[in-house]
Amino acid sequence: MVRRLVAGFGGLVLLLSTALGFLVVAMRSKSPRMLGVVRRFNRGFTNKIQMRTAGTPGAWASVIRHRGRRTGTIYETPVVPFESGAGYLIALPYGTNADWVKNVLAAGSAELVCDGRAIAIDSPEVVSADAITELLPKREQRTQRMFGVDQCLRVRRAMETASV
């Protein structure tokens, strides 16, 4: 019985280590094929789980509401923004190819839901992660280095609106 538990636990650790290794290699290599796998997994699984609490008080992730470039449909995507001066910095692990990034850049504005508050944001600009790294918490700096994140989206606070 104990052997089975140890073997099962060892198998689980191996599986999780392999998945994390793939994720790190995919993100650092910027291989379109590997990033596509990660993006599809996140869109179909991880994002759905994060969206259950994203944007609520105390949640790790926030929500960015953005309008589709072609359809005009409002979409919601979980993001992890960091306050910086008059706005926020959001890491772009997939670069500027993520649909939400393209939508925000095209519209020039969006809405960020953080801690239960909807905040209008505008003036989006892509900045080098190197240029803003000192503005991020140390833990986030390590995470960005590990995953090879080299771009961030800087947005400005337009005005704060009522609680969501």
Say what each PLM segment does.
Residues 1-59, 63-76, 87, 103-109, ...:
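Short amphipathic, positively biased membrane-proximal segments
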Residues 73-77, 117-120:
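Short beta-strand segments
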Residues 74-76, 80-85, 89-100:
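Mid-length scaffold segments of soluble, non-membrane domains
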Residues 95-161:
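Short, structured beta-strand-loop surface elements
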